[in-house]
Design a protein with these regions (language model features):
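Serine-esterase "nucleophile elbow" of acetyl-processing enzymes
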Residues: 1-60, 68
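Alpha-helical cap/lid subdomain in secreted, periplasmic
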Residues: 63-226
C-alpha cells in the first residue's frame, strides 16, 4: 500500500535518495496501486500505509482517521491491506516528529528496530528485542491477524459494506470474513513470480502496482454496484 521502492527518477541526483523523502511523496503515492485506483476512478485518495507498519498500527491509524475525517465514513471506500502478523508496534508518547512524519505516526515499529534503525535509544531497542524473544510465535501472529480481520469486518457491517480487506504478503491462517478478498493468498502472489514486476528488493515496481490495481478494480466494482 505504501509504495516501497517507488522513487521519482527526477530525484536520483539528490544525496542519499530514499523513497521516504517528502520530495518523493507525490511520485510514490501517485504510482502505488492506491494512487492508481484514485486516478482510475477520478477520486481523491488518502494513503495511511507506512513502511514497517504492523496490524496494530494499522488499527490505531484507522481509529485516528475515524476521529479526524470530515466526510461521513459511509461515503468513503475503505481499503485495508493487512501485513504480516509477526510485526509489532509500540506507541511512543514522546515521539519527535520529523518533516516526513504524518500527524498520526507516533509509533515505534519492530521492523524498524530489527532493521537496524539508529534513531531509537537503547531502551527502545532492548524492549522491542526482548518482546520478540519472549512473545514471538505462530499463535500470537494468528491472533493478531484474526483480531484485525474481525475488527474491520465489524466496521464493514457498521458502514454498510464499504470496507474491502486483503493481505499483502499472504495470511497466516485462512479466515472467511465478509469483505475479505482472497482469504488464502496475498497481493504478492500476483507479482512474485514475475521479475519484471519487482523492484530490486522484491517490492512491486510501477508495473507491479498496475497489475495489483487491475486485480482490485473488479472487486471494487462489485462493492460499488452491490
Amino acid at each position: 500500500m505504501w509504495g516501497d521502492e517507488l522513487f521519482d527518477p527526477g530525484l536520483t541526483h539528490l544525496e542519499k535518495p530514499h523513497p521516504v523523502m517528502v520530495e518523493n511523496t507525490p511520485y510514490r503515492e501517485g504510482h502505488c496501486f492506491l494512487g492508481l485506483l484514485g486516478k482510475h476512478y477520478n477520486v481523491p485518495t488518502e494513503n495511511f500505509g507506512i513502511a514497517g507498519g504492523s496490524l496494530q498500527s494499522s488499527l490505531w491509524t484507522y481509529l485516528w482517521w475515524l476521529e479526524h475525517e470530515q466526510l461521513d465514513p459511509r461515503e468513503c471506500l475503505i481499503l485495508v491491506g493487512h501485513t504480516e502478523g509477526n510485526r509489532d508496534s509500540f506507541y511512543n508518547p514522546r515521539h519527535v516528529s520529523y518533516a516526513n512524519d504524518p500527524p498520526w505516526n507516533k509509533f515505534v515499529h519492530s521492523a524498524w528496530i530489527h532493521g537496524g534503525a539508529t534513531c531509537f535509544d537503547s531502551d527502545w531497542v532492548t524492549m522491542v528485542k526482548a518482546n520478540m524473544v519472549l512473545t514471538n510465535c505462530n499463535e500470537l501472529s494468528n491472533l493478531a491477524y484474526r483480531q484485525s480481520v474481525l475488527f474491520f469486518e465489524g466496521q464493514n457491517f457498521k458502514f454498510q459494506n464499504n470496507v474491502i480487506q486483503f493481505t499483502t504478503m499472504g495470511p497466516s491462517i485462512p479466515i472467511n470474513a465478509k469483505g475479505l478478498l482472497w482469504p488464502e493468498h496475498g497481493l504478492v502472489s500476483f507479482v512474485k513470480d514475475n521479475p519484471e514486476l519487482l523492484a530490486p528488493n522484491k517490492h512491486p515496481n510501477e508495473r507491479g502496482h498496475e497489475v495489483i490495481r487491475d486485480h482490485l478494480i473488479p472487486e471494487i466494482e462489485r462493492v460499488i454496484l452491490a
